[in-house]
Regions:
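A short beta-strand-loop structural module common to alpha/beta enzyme folds
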Residues: 49-58
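Short hydrophobic segments within beta-strands
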Residues: 21-25, 53, 139
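Short, catalytically relevant binding-site loops at active-site mouths
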Residues: 57-60, 107-109
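Fold-independent oxyanion-binding glycine-rich loops
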Residues: 25, 55-56, 104, 122
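Glycine-rich phosphate/pyrophosphate-binding loop and the adjoining helix
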Residues: 1-47, 62, 79, 162-191
């Protein structure tokens, strides 16, 4: 609820319905992170226009470290050497979005491989587009601990490195293990 309220009070960039891009690499069936997202998303309508992009099952190749000039060459043309879902779906969605929300299950105190690949591959788009006017939010679910570590990774990668701005209390962090456990946490409907 609190995260939804923060999104609802997000300053509109001159649009009646700001655009929110939700990125995840999780299974809807078993994911506590996605269950929390469904709860947050249900509170956003009709004020926000939300678009969801899934980055799982081998759809996203990580950056392999192109030379700077090659990354710059493709980035200035709105693409990336590796193409795929990043160039076809993610880059256009990031361009349209006023804010991003990342669903981040905590895997060993780190972002998932697919979300890390998203951040790495965002560099090519950053060559052409600055993100100063785009906010970043997060849902972080950990089995035991480390949500703060994952949130710090997002701050470092997206706020400090890629220039997304960081609203106060940008992340909802929860601890859950078994599927559905996050929604049973005391007071979760208020956070």
């Amino acid at each position: 609820r609190e995260l939804a309220e923060r999104l609802l009070t997000f300053p509109s960039p001159g649009r009646e319905r700001p655009r929110l891009l939700a990125l995840h690499a999780s299974s809807h069936h078993t994911s506590n992170t996605m269950a929390l997202w469904a709860q947050v998303q249900s509170r956003l309508s009709p004020r926000w226009e939300a678009e969801e992009v899934g980055l799982r099952n081998g759809t996203l190749s990580d950056c392999s470290g192109c030379p700077y000039t090659m990354c710059l060459h493709f980035g200035e043309r709105g693409g990336c050497f590796y193409g795929g879902v990043m160039q076809e779906a993610v880059y256009p969605a990031v361009r349209r979005a006023d804010a991003l929300i990342l669903m981040c299950p905590n895997y060993n105190d780190a972002l998932s491989a697919n979300l890390s690949a998203f951040i790495n591959r965002l560099t090519a788009l950053f060559r052409q587009t600055r993100f100063y006017e785009k906010a970043v939010f997060a849902l972080v679910v950990s089995g035991y601990s480390g949500s703060d570590t994952v949130a710090r990774q997002l701050i470092s990668a997206l706020n400090m490195n890629k220039s997304f701005y960081l609203p106060s209390n940008f992340a909802l962090m929860e601890t859950a293990n078994a599927p559905g456990e996050a929604l049973a946490s005391p007071g979760i409907e208020l956070r």
